[in-house]
Amino acid sequence: MSLSDPIANFLTSIRNGQLSMNKVVTVSYSYVIHAILQILLSEGYIDGFTEKLRSTNIKFFEVKLKYYNGVPVINRICRVSKPGKRCYCSAKGMPKFYNGLGLYIISTSKGIMSDYNARKSGVGGEILCGVF
């Protein structure tokens, strides 16, 4: 478990949980992960998530993964901007993930949002991850 990149740990937990057909995975708590989970829930990639508290007063999320006819809804989830190489884009130069079938999650000055909402708001930012 890499403590230098909690977003990559979160994405790997989701990917591994879907590949092993788990119904629920647990991920560490952070405000960025909470915002990403809200976007995944609103776009229909997960069934839901709850915030829990361990006996040692450490917060974590339980994420309910979504399947359609036994097939994971998330085909590909990947980290784009990494700690060693950041990836930024403007609102006009924002790429589309899988020709618009997937979505990028972007950290902007107005908060963390999907690429569609960032284009609509006219803001660019750091591309955190892509989901298809």
Curated annotation (Swiss-Prot):
The keyword Hydrolase appears for this protein: no
GO molecular function, one term: rRNA binding
One Gene Ontology cellular component annotation held by this UniProt entry: ribonucleoprotein complex
Disulfide bond annotation, renumbered to this chain: none
One GO biological process term: translation
TM annotation in the entry: none
UniProtKB keywords: Ribonucleoprotein, Ribosomal protein, RNA-binding, rRNA-binding
Superkingdom in the source lineage: Bacteria
Pfam families xref list: Ribosomal_S8
Purpose: One of the primary rRNA binding proteins, it binds directly to 16S rRNA central domain where it helps coordinate assembly of the platform of the 30S subunit.
Oligomeric and partner information: Part of the 30S ribosomal subunit. Contacts proteins S5 and S12.
Family of the protein in this entry: Belongs to the universal ribosomal protein uS8 family.
Full protein name: Small ribosomal subunit protein uS8
